[in-house]
């Protein structure tokens, strides 16, 4: 059973993961409007950055319409109660970028690594703690690690100073049992004072269900986004999660009607590619592929006259992970040569 008295930390990711859905092209006016609506609806934190984190704007990942710091400052200017979060991937963002994000208004940082590479996060986690930031370890592609292995990686991040460890279903490839096993393993090894979080993707339509199961196993923080705005088929849709949680009597602290209105009136009209489960986004969950590969794979498929589905499935077979976007072209050329 889920503790109905426990306050769930609602972490919105519309302005970070949602960047993938608009090719990192949110205007400053758009981020301010979305953030204001989220703040008024009662979310606890609002993550702001390029889809691939601080300094993700690049040829490899896609150029942003603005800098991370401009987006963060635009949000900081309008929010009254929610804390601003940001994402940092070691090797893309640096501690200098983190300081700039802090100066712009960010007070939570999620330091993200592949689920086998927690050791590269030490410098960034320690520096974030020295700034007094709420510091989170974010283990991407968690389906590619065993529950025990993932827990060991989480313990490493905790030892560096992380105050919360996230199970991150970047591929939207896990089911409820997968989530339960990973949270049980985490709770077995982490200090009771260390929180845990869930970041779902909706590629198998399990984003909300997986988030609820995470709560059943002691999860403290839940990521979600308006309309599910995010990579692939998106994240757990925030307005849906909040409605489901309310029907279960859970303490999420948000105004469901305000979330629904913000989703429909502000965010959904911005989707140039509808965020939903379809042939291509289902391929991500089916093959266990990093969700942000979607738009890159679609571009490669269009360029070479191939099926996006086939490219994504082959990427899954090769166990490609975040940061290997350049391999999408290699896979496309291999498929082309195979006829």
Curated annotation (Swiss-Prot):
Active site annotation, chain numbering: 20 (proton acceptor)
Catalyzed reaction equations: (S)-4-hydroxy-2-oxopentanoate = acetaldehyde + pyruvate
Xref: PROSITE patterns: PYR_CT
Pyruvate carboxyltransferase domain segment(s): 8-260
Domain of life (superkingdom): Bacteria
Enzyme class, broadest EC rank: lyase
E.C. number: 4.1.3.39
Keyword tRNA-binding included in the entry's annotation: no
Keyword Manganese tagged: yes
GO annotation, biological process: catabolic process; L-leucine biosynthetic process
Binding site for Mn(2+): 17, 199, 201
Alphabetical keyword list: Aromatic hydrocarbons catabolism, Lyase, Manganese, Metal-binding
Pfam families registered for this protein in UniProt: DmpG_comm, HMGL-like
A GO term for molecular function: 2-isopropylmalate synthase activity
InterPro entries: 2-IPM_HCS-like, 4OH_2_O-val_aldolase, Aldolase_TIM, DmpG_comm, DRE_TIM_HOA, PYR_CT
Family annotation (NCBIfam families): 4OH_2_O_val_ald, PRK08195.1
Protein name: 4-hydroxy-2-oxovalerate aldolase 2
């Amino acid at each position: 059973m889920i503790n109905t008295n426990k306050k769930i930390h609602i972490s919105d990711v519309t302005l970070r993961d949602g960047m993938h859905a608009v090719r990192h092209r949110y205007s400053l006016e758009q981020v301010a409007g979305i953030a204001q609506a989220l703040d008024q609806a009662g979310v606890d934190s609002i993550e702001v950055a390029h889809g691939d984190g601080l300094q993700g704007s690049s040829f490899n990942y896609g150029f942003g319409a603005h800098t991370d710091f401009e987006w963060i400052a635009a949000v900081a200017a309008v929010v009254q109660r929610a804390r601003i979060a940001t994402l940092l991937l070691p090797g893309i963002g640096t501690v200098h970028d983190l300081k700039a994000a802090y100066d712009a208004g960010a007070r939570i940082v999620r330091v993200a690594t592949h689920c086998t590479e927690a050791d590269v996060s030490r410098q960034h986690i320690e520096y974030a703690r020295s700034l007094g930031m709420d510091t989170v370890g974010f283990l991407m592609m968690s389906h590619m690690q065993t529950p025990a292995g993932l827990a060991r990686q989480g313990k490493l991040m905790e030892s560096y100073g992380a105050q919360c460890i996230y199970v991150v279903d970047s591929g939207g490839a896990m089911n409820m049992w997968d989530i339960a096993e990973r949270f049980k393993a985490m709770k077995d090894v982490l200090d009771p004072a260390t929180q845990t979080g869930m970041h779902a993707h909706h590629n198998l339509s399990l984003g909300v269900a997986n988030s609820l199961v995470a709560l059943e196993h002691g999860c403290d923080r839940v990521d979600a986004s308006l309309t599910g705005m995010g990579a692939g088929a998106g994240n757990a849709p925030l307005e849906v999660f909040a409605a489901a949680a309310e029907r279960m009597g859970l303490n999420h602290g948000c105004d469901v009607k305000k979330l629904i209105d913000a989703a429909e009136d502000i965010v959904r009209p911005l989707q140039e590619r509808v965020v939903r489960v379809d042939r291509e986004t289902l391929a991500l969950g089916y093959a266990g592929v990093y969700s942000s590969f979607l738009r890159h794979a679609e571009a490669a498929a269009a360029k070479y006259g191939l099926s996006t589905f086939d490219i994504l499935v082959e990427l899954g077979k090769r166990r490609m992970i975040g940061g290997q976007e350049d391999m999408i072209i290699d896979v496309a050329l291999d498929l082309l040569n195979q006829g």
